[in-house]
Structure formats: C-alpha cells, structure tokens
C-alpha cells in the first residue's frame, strides 16, 4: 500500500519494483491467512495437533517464491502453534488427556515392541525409509531408563538425517545442536537453568527484579514455610512472602524481616556472581530480623546464589 520501489526485509532478500513488491507481499500475507484459516477449519472438524501437521499444507502457488518457501519456519509447526494459541494444549487426542511421564512412556512402548534390541533394529531400518518414524523410535530409546551410548548415538544419527532433509533453517539448526548435545559434544547446561544478566536487569525496578524469583521456588523446600521479607535497595522497597509453597511479591509492608544492600550487590545476587552467604559475611547484605529464617527462606530458590 506504500507503493515502495525498494523493500529491505527483515528476513529474506531485498526487493525492487513497486508492482513486484506488491504482488509478492500480497502472496506472503495470503499464505499466513491460509495457515490460520485452515488450522481453524480442521480444528473445528476435530483434527488433533499431529493431524494438523499433515492436513494443513501450503498450496503449490506459495512454493515458487523465496518469501513463502519454508526456509525459516515450516507450515506444520505454524499450524500447531496457531491451534495451541487459540484452543490450549489439549488437542482432543485421548492419549494426551492424561499422558505418561516421558521416561515411563518410552519404557512401556519399548517393552511392548519387544525390548530395546528390537526397537534399535526397527529404528535403524526406519532411518532409511521413514525418517519421522525412525526419529521417534530413536527418541524413545534415548528416554529409556537404561539408555546406552549406542542409543544416544542412534538419536544423534536420526537428528542429523532429519537436518539434512529439511529446507527449514530453524529445524536444521535445532536438530544439529541437539545431536551434539545428546552425544555430549557440547555443553548445553546453561540453557537448562535460570539465567539473569546484568544488562537485562539493569533497567528493572526493584519490585520487578525481585518478582522474577517467584518462578524459581523448589516446592519441596517450602514445607511449613511462612516468611515475609522486605527488600530495601537504595531507597526502593518491596517484599517477598514465602508461603504455601509459593513466593508472593508484596510491598514489604509489615514484613518482620528486612534485607538491605546496594543495587550492585542485589544485581550480583540475581546474576549469581555473589552468593547470599558471601554477601552476609562481607557485610554487603544486612538483615534486620531473624537471619536464619531469612536464609532458610531464600534457600528454597532454585538459584545458586541462595542455595545453602
């Protein structure tokens, strides 16, 4: 609608020519509507998430332009994302209403198929004829309680096979990275823990930064806990109430305990560059109230700075 003669895209090549730009962007826009509308259509007809992945396919007319080819995401992922966003996690498949734990599922399935050896053989065969099935079987073997290095290697092979056959950079890069992960060739541990960076939290007020801690509670460590703590940092004040296996952000009013420190120290605690015990020992953190109760409350956090 702007009549632009040149378009620099966030994803994709630059375009020139007002008519060409208009036609190609219209096609791009229509491809998105197609995915949305057909996802809703098939969902209304009872399709599950897995079924949507195979029923909602972009027509051939969208396959001849870089803007609508599946170099980045893929249609089957978009369809499932649309469905989940509109209707929630349960897709109508009875198997998904009360699913087994991942490891339990793998062990039951492998046992039903004749054991790990039988499944390995089927997986190896499937990787030459049906990569999706092979990847699924390899994943189940790797989830098994008695998974071996051979099983993890088979999963890595399956992932690399899928990576070589997809046009999607997202899928390809994830599969290659996961293959390296399951082989132990790269350390992905930092992606499986809470991470807060100084630049990230520098612009947050105290209440926002303290409130983030609520999602780091380990419920098993909260049995019987009821500890309301005010946090005071350079003129700002908020509160954290450890109770009922949750951490409830408060204003700090009427809290019987107060933790005080500088903003630099507080940020250091959140980023893990200093621990609460170290800060208490150096005097960088002071506690007015029951010090042991405060330390015990904070130790319920799944965060290295507060773990006892």
Regions found by a protein language model. Give the residues of each.
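Divalent-metal (often Zn2+) His-rich catalytic cores of metallo-beta-lactamase-fold enzymes
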Residues: 1-51, 55-96, 154, 158-161
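Helix-loop elements that line ligand-binding/catalytic pockets
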Residues: 73-79, 87-119, 228-230
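Short coil turns that delineate tetratricopeptide repeat
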Residues: 146-147
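Amphipathic alpha-helical repeat elements characteristic of tetratricopeptide repeat
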Residues: 29, 33, 113-120, 132, ...
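Alpha-helix boundary/N-cap detector
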Residues: 70, 74, 114, 118, ...
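Solvent-exposed, amphipathic alpha-helical segments
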Residues: 31-45, 119-122, 265, 269-272
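Feature captures hydrophobic
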Residues: 125, 133-136, 143, 152-308
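Alpha-helical segment of the N-proximal tetratricopeptide repeat
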Residues: 105-140
């Amino acid at each position: 609608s702007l009549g632009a003669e040149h378009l620099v895209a966030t994803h994709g090549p630059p375009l020139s020519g007002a008519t060409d730009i208009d036609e190609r962007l219209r096609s791009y826009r229509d491809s998105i509507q197609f995915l949305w509308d057909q996802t809703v259509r098939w969902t209304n007809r009872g399709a599950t998430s897995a079924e949507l992945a195979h029923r909602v396919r972009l027509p051939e007319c969208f396959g001849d332009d870089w803007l609508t080819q599946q170099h980045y995401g893929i249609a089957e992922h978009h369809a499932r994302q649309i469905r989940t966003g509109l209707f929630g996690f349960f897709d109508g498949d009875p198997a998904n209403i009360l699913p087994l734990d991942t490891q339990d599922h793998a062990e039951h399935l492998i046992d039903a198929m004749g054991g790990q050896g039988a499944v390995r053989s089927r997986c190896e065969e499937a990787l030459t004829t049906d990569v999706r099935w092979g990847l699924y079987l390899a994943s189940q073997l790797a989830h098994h309680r008695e998974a071996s290095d051979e099983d993890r290697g088979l999963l890595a092979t399956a992932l690399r096979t899928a990576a070589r056959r997809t046009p999607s950079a997202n899928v390809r890069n994830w599969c290659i990275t996961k293959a390296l992960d399951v082989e132990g060739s790269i350390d992905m541990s930092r992606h499986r823990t809470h991470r807060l960076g100084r630049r990230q939290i520098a612009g947050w007020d105290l209440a926002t930064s303290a409130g983030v801690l609520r999602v780091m509670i380990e419920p098993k460590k909260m049995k019987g806990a009821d500890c309301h703590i005010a946090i005071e940092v350079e003129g700002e004040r908020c509160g954290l109430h450890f109770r009922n296996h949750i951490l409830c952000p408060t204003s700090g009013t009427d809290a019987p305990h107060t933790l005080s420190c500088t903003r630099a120290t507080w940020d250091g605690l959140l980023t893990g560059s200093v621990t609460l015990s170290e800060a208490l020992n150096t005097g960088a953190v002071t506690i007015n109230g029951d010090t042991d109760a405060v330390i015990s409350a904070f130790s319920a956090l799944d965060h290295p700075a507060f773990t006892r």
